[in-house]
Amino acid sequence: MEPPAAPSERSLSLSLPGPREGQATLKPPPQHLWRQPRTPIRIQQRGYSDSAERSEPERSPHRPIERADAVDTGDRPGLRTTRMSWPSSFHGTGTGGGSSRRLEAENGPTPSPGRSPLDSQASPGLMLHAGAATSQRRESFLYRSDSDYDMSPKTMSRNSSVASEAHGEDLIVTPFAQVLASLRNVRSNFSLLTNVPIPSNKRSPLGGPPSVCKATLSEETCQQLARETLEELDWCLEQLETMQTYRSVSEMASHKFKRMLNRELTHLSEMSRSGNQVSEYISNTFLDKQHEVEIPSPTPRQRPFQQPPPAAVQQAQPMSQITGLKKLVHTGSLNINVPRFGVKTDQEDLLAQELENLSKWGLNIFCVSEYAGGRSLSCIMYTIFQERDLLKKFHIPVDTMMTYMLTLEDHYHADVAYHNSLHAADVLQSTHVLLATPALDAVFTDLEILAALFAAAIHDVDHPGVSNQFLINTNSELALMYNDESVLENHHLAVGFKLLQEENCDIFQNLSKRQRQSLRKMVIDMVLATDMSKHMTLLADLKTMVETKKVTSSGVLLLDNYSDRIQVLRNMVHCADLSNPTKPLELYRQWTDRIMAEFFQQGDRERERGMEISPMCDKHTASVEKSQVGFIDYIVHPLWETWADLVHPDAQDILDTLEDNRDWYHSAIRQSPSPTLEEEPGVLSDPALPDKFQFELTLEEEDEEDSLEVPGLPCTEETLLAPHDTRAQAMEQSKVKGQSPAVVEVAESLKQETASAHGAPEESAEAVGHSFSLETSILPDLRTLSPSEEAQGLLGLPSMAAEVEAPRDHLAAMRACSACSGTSGDNSAVISAPGRWGSGGDPA
């Protein structure tokens, strides 16, 4: 493989340790390590309970996770398009490992699916098998080659998902699992070359005599096999020599995944300015910047002038005091007439109808909130605890349970658009469904189940509606108290446990001291894992666990220690926290509206303070649809893909819904209506028009870019670096045609350059500090849409009209604009954009 190219100076970059002086760079793994025989995984069930009384109910046969929706997909534009390899910003960089040579001398038959080769007394479990229905499912960026930094998407394509399933193989991407697989291969080759039979022992219970005898191999073949075996052993030694002894093996995968994500984000950021914004958002939110990420600041010409933030005036308070607690009084008459679902409501029948889907994926939590009088968290929490019989198992008084639930829900902020009690109820219900996954049946103890549900319920309590970085940048008391480390997550834990000390709120009062300590430790671990900056570490831990079991001979995930068990539980709650894109589309779109409203509200606060506005928080520039596509491609899909491997085939429907939703948002970008020629002259005159840019370039569009590029014109980057050069602006216009989806990017950059040259217009008053009701629409109230934005688009969101490709309109405009600067009347075919991109909306 070719060495990686040096990253662009303007791209996002990871500060990763390079090789020591005099040390050669690590070789890429042997090609066959990309593919290993598909090994079924079984999660061993427990045979005990830690509750006071062992009364295990009769368990129903295994069944897949049910979906609560029955959505007609006929009107989804995304489902009618050809499904592509994703992420869309980088169309394949793999080397097509399916053609590489593989040596499979040791791979014998798989064990019986009902019994562990290591433990004859193990309970029957669910095995991980390849499903024919999933053979066409696309794979995440984690399955791209780690070494192909400089391969062009024009010349490379990768269809590994189809090939791997067709050959019954798994793709192995975590370094430690690759080392294990390589050592097994070396062992097999050694046996073949020396005619030494492989003993049937615990290292190779599946093995047997090699399927190929040395006598049947030619001398040349034996020499080649020996060389390849030696090279593979050298590669293993090199990997082990560079492993840092004080770090876990999963950190090798975390290090690799972050490097690969950085490469993907670099490609995305180079596509357009909005692509750079999406990249910056993902990098800032989901990578632990404190130690590993270094993002270059904008150049002086790019950074707008901003007033320094005003000095914060705050009342001094003891640092040991937990903020956000309220003195609430809930009547003690709750234990007299306990409502059926824990909350008083006049629509109990409708609520009961909705809660029939409590154990199904895709429960409409918005309807539950409406029928429960806005008490969705209390309703869901009480109903789940009753259904799982946790009140009896842990002797939780009903009135105490109800008092704590109501107190907890009251400490969620109803005026926060997304991180409110509705989100907590959704995560709680999603965790409940994931705990009921057939593959995890009888795996976790009652105490672990209680801890997971409690962690989901409190994981965002007293959330202020701003990010950790905002609190750090504003020197908030919370950031000072928790030393800038997982600020909000630590606060949620403190509030959640502190509320147990309120009157008649201690739902764990009858737990033993040991149970209480164990539960607290688990809850802390799970809630801290909801810090999105820890995402790549969590993903690497889980994927290393799954792939290590795939390449071992047993294929049994024992989960026989705290570290392994809490690792699965942490990822479960993390998956539930990132489950919005996997829900039915109508629910997903509502969640998207809410999270964008919260982002925009934070952006308004940052603008008021004169701070730099966080990525995706500026309502004038954020591209909602593209942010969701990038969010799915780089964050949600790799996580759920790995979870689906763990519990296969139980999460296949969830992956299908995720793919459908991603296609819908992608199609919403491509199918938005174009502005009419009559509207175009006024586009640049509207200072409130959002900057929205297309971040995806298809292969055809890139070819078009090459063919339509005007010789002698400066590149986009050079033009942007000279904002006051009006001639450069005019020359930039003639290059837009080749990147037609990014037309508005250039238009808006020119608009900003013009504004900076003539003095930026006074900023209009926007909705700041807006309060949101859980039952009302969110985004439409943020600002008044301009006429060009009122074209049909996503419900409650600005239209994508300015972004969509309209070649015919452009061609007509080009012919009418032959007088533009930098073009000539006899060469209208190479004019790049309509005349509206000229200064003042008229041809230059």
Curated annotation (Swiss-Prot):
GO biological process terms, semicolon-separated: cAMP catabolic process; cellular response to xenobiotic stimulus; regulation of adenylate cyclase-activating G protein-coupled receptor signaling pathway; regulation of cAMP/PKA signal transduction; sensory perception of smell; signal transduction
InterPro entries: HD/PDEase_dom, PDE4_UCR, PDEase, PDEase_catalytic_dom, PDEase_catalytic_dom_sf, PDEase_CS
Residues annotated for AMP binding in this entry: H419, H423, D460, D577, Q628, F631
Compositionally biased tracts (Basic and acidic residues): 51-78
Amino acids binding Mg(2+): D460
The organism's place on the tree of life at top rank: Eukaryota
Ranges of compositional bias, category Low complexity: 36-46
Residues engaged in binding Zn(2+) 2: D460
TM region positions: none
Pfam families (alphabetical): PDE4_UCR, PDEase_I
Boundaries of every PDEase domain copy: 343-672
Active site (record annotation): H419
Protein function: Hydrolyzes the second messenger 3',5'-cyclic AMP (cAMP), which is a key regulator of many important physiological processes.
Protein name, as recorded: 3',5'-cyclic-AMP phosphodiesterase 4A
